[in-house]
C-alpha cells in the first residue's frame, strides 16, 4: 500500500471480525455504512476501515461501541440492491490502530494512529515452541473438521499448507463459532505466539462442545432404540396373551377398574363403565377407539359421585352476606331469604323451585347469584347462554361423532367437583334455535324439579341426578319460551333510583375503582354532588355498569395527573372540575317550565332507565274542530287524547264554554322530543288539563306535575312506575305531584327523602285535578 492514510471512512461490523489478507462479500444496509462506502469510492481511493462493534445488538451511539483496532480494506466491487442496500466485496490489507472515531455528516470516520501494528511475516520468528503450537492447531483442526464437517477435504489440505502463520491463524479463526470478543483478541494480538495460543484455546473449546453434542446425540439415539425395542416386545407379549386367551392385566386397566369399584356411582353408571372397560381391554392401545373408551370412562369417573359441599343453614349469615354485597332491593333480598329458609327447613332433597332474576343490565343479577353461593356455602358455576343455538351445548354430543364431549351442564358439574353447586344460567332469555335443535327445549328437563333427577346427557348415555343442584337463572326480559318460563319462579329487579345509585357509588363503586387503579382515600375524594352529576349527566341506565366505567375513567385521569405532578396533593372531584375529567355533559334531564303557560302541562313518564318529566303542549287555532297530534305518539296515547277530548266536552258547562266550542278551533297537541317514541295511558289527566287550559285560556301552574289515566267518566285510574316518576319530579324542581288515589299504597316503596321534599296529592277524578292546576 503506497498511500499514507490518516483518515478513512468506517463500516461498523456486527457479529463478525474481518482479518487482513481476507477477501469476502459484505451486505451494507445502515445509512452511515452506505455513506462510508460512497465516501471511500469518491474520496479515499476505495480504502475503508472495517471495525467490529463491541455489542452488536446495541441501539445506542455506534461511535462509542467500536473496537479501537480494525482492518484497513479496499472495496473491490460495489453492487446496488433493489431495497437500497449495497453488496460489496472487500479485500483486507492490514490491521490499524484507531486514535479517534468521529461521526460527520452521516458518516463515521477513523483517525488512524501513526503507530505501525501491521502483521509482517518474519521466518526468523518461527522457533520450536511456535512450531509445536502450530502443529497442535493443525491436529485440533483435523478433529474439528471430522466432527463438524464444516470444511471439505480439499479446503482443509489448502488451509494446512498455508505457509504464512498469520494468514493460517486468521483463516482458521474465521470458520470457528467462537465469541466475537475472542476473535477480536486474535486480531489485536501483536505477538505471533500469543495469537496462535489464543486460536488454540478457541479450538479446544469448540472441540469440547462438539464432543459433548455428539455424546448427547448418541444417548438420545440409544434411548429411542430402547423405546422401540420395548414397544416391539410389548406388542409380542400382547399377541401371545391373545393367542392363549388370557386377560392382559395391564396396570392402566387395573387402575381404572379399582377406581370404578371405589367410586359411589349409580348401578347403571357402574355397569356401563365395566362394559366399556371390557371393550378397552380387547383394543390395541394405539387405536382411536381405545382413546374414545378411555375418555368416556374418565369422564364418568370425574363426575362428583356422592361428593357434596356442606350447605350452610344459617339464615342470619345469608342475610348479612346479601346486605353486604348489595344495596337496596329489599324485596328481592327478602324473597331470596324466604327461598333459602324453606330449603333449610325442608329436607335437603326436597324439590325446590328454580329462581329467575329478571331485570335490566347492570342491576346486579349475576352478582346476586354469587352472593347466594357464598351465603349457602355452595360452589359457584356459571353458564353463559347468550347466543347458544345448539341443543348439544346442553345435552352433549353422542359418542358416534368424532371429538364428542358432554354438554355444558355436565362439564360445569365436573368443574364444581360437588353434586350440589349453585348453577347460574346467565342470560336465559338470549337462547335461540336453528336447524341444530332448540336449546330451550333441552333446558326443560334440566330445570324441572320433577325430571332433573334423571337428566340424560347424550354423551354419558346414563341418568345423572341434578336435583341437588341449586339452579338460578337471569334474564333481561320475560321473552322466554312459555314452557320454560312455567318452570321458573320470577323475581323482578327494577332499575336503581338516583338516591340508590349515589349510595352504591359511595359504598361499592368508588372503593372498587380506587383499588383497581392503585389509589387510596388519601389521594382522591369524590364529593356527593360530583357523584350525583356523574349519575345525571354522564350515564343513562337502569343499573350501575356505566357509572362504574365513568368513575374508573375519573380515577385513571387522576392517577395520570398525580404521576405528572407528585406535589399536587389530594385530588378532589367536585361539580366544578368534573368536566375536566369526563368532558362536557352527555345527557340532560327534564326540569320544570320557567313560568306558567296556557296549554303547557308537565306529565310524568316511566322509562327503562328511570322516570322523566314529560312536557305536553296544546295549541288552539281558528278552524273547524280538527285535531292534530305529533311527537311520535303510540296508538294508546292517541286514544288517550281522544278520550281526553270527550271528557272536556262532558265538563264544558263547568267552565262556561259554548256548546259548539270545539267546532270553532283546530287543536294541535305535541309532545316534545319528537324522535323519541312515546306510548301509554298514564298521560291521560295531563292531556285533559292541557285541553282545558287551551279552551279556557288559563295558564297551568309550572310547579305541578301529574300522572294518571283518565276514563270517559272523568275517573283517574292507577299507573305504574310511581317511584321513578316521583324521583324525576323532585329532580326537575317540581313542588307538587298529582297521583291516582289507587296508587297511595305504592308510596310505601318510595324513599322517605323523596316524600318529605314533595307534596303528594292523591286524586280520584279529573275535577280534583283541575281544581289544583289553575
UniProtKB/Swiss-Prot annotation:
Active-site annotation: 682, 725
Reactions that this protein is recorded to catalyse: Hydrolysis of proteins in presence of ATP
Record's subcellular location: Cytoplasm
GO CC terms: cytoplasm
A Pfam family hit: Lon_C
Main location, first listed in the record: cytoplasm
Binding, ATP: 359-366
InterPro entries: AAA+_ATPase, ATPase_AAA_core, Lon_bac, Lon_bac/euk-typ, Lon_lid, Lon_proteolytic, Lon_Prtase, Lon_prtase_N
Gene3D superfamilies named among the record's database cross-references: 1.10.8.60, 1.20.5.5270, 1.20.58.1480, 3.30.230.10, LON domain-like (2.30.130.40), P-loop containing nucleotide triphosphate hydrolases (3.40.50.300)
PANTHER family recorded: ATP DEPENDENT LON PROTEASE FAMILY MEMBER (PTHR10046)
Entry similarity comment: Belongs to the peptidase S16 family.
UniProt name for this protein: Lon protease
Species the sequence originates in: Francisella philomiragia subsp. philomiragia (strain ATCC 25017 / CCUG 19701 / FSC 153 / O#319-036)
Gene designation: lon
Amino acid at each position: 500500500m503506497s498511500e499514507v492514510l490518516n483518515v478513512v471512512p468506517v463500516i461498523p461490523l456486527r457479529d463478525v471480525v474481518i482479518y487482513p489478507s481476507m477477501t469476502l462479500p459484505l451486505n451494507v444496509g445502515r445509512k452511515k455504512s452506505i455513506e462510508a462506502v460512497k465516501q471511500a469510492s469518491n474520496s479515499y481511493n476505495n480504502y475503508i476501515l472495517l471495525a467490529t462493534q463491541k455489542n452488536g445488538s446495541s441501539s445506542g451511539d455506534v461511535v462509542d461501541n467500536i473496537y479501537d483496532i480494525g482492518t484497513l480494506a479496499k472495496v473491490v466491487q460495489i453492487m446496488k440492491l433493489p431495497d437500497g442496500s449495497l453488496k460489496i466485496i472487500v479485500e483486507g490489507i492490514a490491521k490499524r490502530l484507531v486514535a479517534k472515531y468521529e461521526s460527520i455528516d452521516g458518516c463515521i470516520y477513523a483517525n488512524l494512529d501513526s503507530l505501525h501494528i501491521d502483521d509482517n511475516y518474519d521466518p526468523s520468528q518461527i522457533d520450536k515452541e511456535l512450531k509445536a503450537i502450530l502443529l497442535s492447531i493443525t491436529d485440533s483442526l483435523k478433529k474439528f473438521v471430522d466432527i463438524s464437517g464444516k470444511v471439505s477435504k480439499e479446503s482443509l489440505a489448502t488451509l494446512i499448507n498455508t505457509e504464512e502463520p498469520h494468514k493460517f491463524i486468521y483463516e482458521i479463526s474465521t470458520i470457528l463459532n467462537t465469541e466475537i470478543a475472542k476473535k477480536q483478541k486474535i486480531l489485536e494480538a501483536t505477538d505471533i505466539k500469543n495469537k496462535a495460543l489464543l486460536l488454540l484455546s478457541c479450538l479446544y473449546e469448540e472441540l469440547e462442545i462438539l464432543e459433548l453434542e455428539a455424546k448427547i446425540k448418541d444417548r438420545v439415539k440409544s434411548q429411542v432404540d430402547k423405546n422401540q425395542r420395548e414397544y416391539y416386545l410389548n406388542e409380542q407379549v400382547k399377541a401371545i396373551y391373545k393367542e392363549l386367551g388370557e386377560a392382559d392385566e395391564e396396570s392402566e386397566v387395573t387402575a381404572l377398574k379399582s377406581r370404578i369399584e371405589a367410586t359411589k356411582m349409580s348401578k347403571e353408571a357402574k355397569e356401563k363403565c365395566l362394559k366399556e372397560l371390557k371393550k378397552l381391554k380387547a383394543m390395541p392401545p394405539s387405536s382411536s377407539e381405545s382413546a374414545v373408551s378411555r375418555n368416556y370412562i374418565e369422564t364418568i369417573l370425574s363426575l362428583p359421585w356422592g361428593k357434596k359441599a356442606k350447605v350452610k343453614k344459617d339464615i342470619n349469615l345469608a342475610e348479612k352476606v346479601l346486605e353486604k354485597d348489595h344495596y337496596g332491593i329489599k324485596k328481592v333480598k327478602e324473597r331470596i331469604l324466604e327461598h333459602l329458609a324453606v330449603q333449610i327447613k325442608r329436607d335437603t332433597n326436597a324439590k325446590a323451585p328454580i329462581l329467575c332474576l329478571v331485570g335490566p343490565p347492570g342491576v346486579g343479577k349475576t352478582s346476586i347469584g354469587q352472593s347466594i353461593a357464598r351465603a349457602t356455602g355452595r360452589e359457584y358455576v356459571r353458564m353463559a347462554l347468550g347466543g347458544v343455538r345448539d341443543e348439544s351445548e346442553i345435552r352433549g354430543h353422542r359418542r358416534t361423532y368424532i371429538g364428542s364431549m358432554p354438554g355444558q351442564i355436565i362439564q360445569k358439574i365436573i368443574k364444581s367437583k360437588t353434586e350440589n353447586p349453585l348453577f347460574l344460567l346467565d342470560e336465559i332469555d338470549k337462547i335461540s334455535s336453528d336447524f341444530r335443535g332448540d336449546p330451550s327445549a333441552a333446558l326443560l328437563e334440566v330445570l324441572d324439579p320433577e325430571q332433573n333427577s334423571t337428566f340424560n346427557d347424550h354423551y354419558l348415555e346414563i341418568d345423572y341426578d341434578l336435583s341437588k343442584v341449586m339452579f338460578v337463572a337471569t334474564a333481561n326480559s320475560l321473552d322466554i319460551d312459555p314452557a320454560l318460563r312455567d318452570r321458573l319462579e320470577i323475581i323482578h329487579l327494577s332499575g336503581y333510583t338516583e338516591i340508590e345509585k349515589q349510595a352504591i357509588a359511595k359504598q361499592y363503586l368508588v372503593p372498587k375503582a380506587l383499588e383497581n387503579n392503585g389509589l387510596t382515600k388519601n389521594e382522591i375524594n369524590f364529593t356527593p354532588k360530583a357523584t350525583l352529576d356523574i349519575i345525571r349527566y354522564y350515564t343513562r341506565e337502569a343499573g350501575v355498569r356505566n357509572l362504574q366505567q365513568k368513575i374508573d375513567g375519573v380515577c385513571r385521569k387522576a392517577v395520570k395527573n398525580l404521576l405528572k405532578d407528585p406535589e399536587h396533593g389530594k385530588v378532589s372531584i367536585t361539580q366544578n372540575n368534573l368536566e375536566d375529567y369526563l368532558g362536557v355533559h352527555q345527557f340532560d334531564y327534564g326540569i320544570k317550565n320557567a313560568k306558567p303557560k296556557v296549554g303547557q302541562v308537565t306529565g310524568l313518564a316511566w322509562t327503562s332507565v328511570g322516570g322523566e318529566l314529560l312536557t305536553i303542549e296544546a295549541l288552539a287555532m281558528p278552524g273547524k274542530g280538527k285535531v292534530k297530534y305529533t311527537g311520535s305518539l303510540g296508538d294508546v296515547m292517541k286514544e288517550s287524547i281522544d278520550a281526553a277530548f270527550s271528557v272536556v266536552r262532558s265538563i264544558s258547562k263547568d267552565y262556561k264554554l259554548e256548546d259548539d266550542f270545539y267546532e270553532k278551533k283546530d287543536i294541535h297537541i305535541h309532545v316534545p322530543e319528537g324522535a323519541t317514541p312515546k306510548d301509554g295511558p298514564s298521560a291521560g289527566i295531563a292531556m285533559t288539563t292541557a285541553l282545558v287550559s287551551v279552551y279556557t285560556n288559563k295558564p297551568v301552574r309550572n310547579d305541578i306535575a301529574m300522572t294518571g289515566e283518565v276514563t270517559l267518566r272523568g275517573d283517574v285510574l292507577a299507573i305504574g312506575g310511581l317511584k321513578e316518576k316521583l324521583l324525576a319530579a323532585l329532580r326537575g324542581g317540581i313542588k307538587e305531584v298529582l297521583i291516582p288515589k289507587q296508587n297511595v299504597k305504592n308510596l310505601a316503596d318510595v324513599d322517605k327523602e323523596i316524600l318529605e321534599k314533595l307534596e303528594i296529592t292523591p286524586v280520584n277524578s279529573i275535577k280534583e285535578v283541575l281544581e289544583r292546576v289553575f
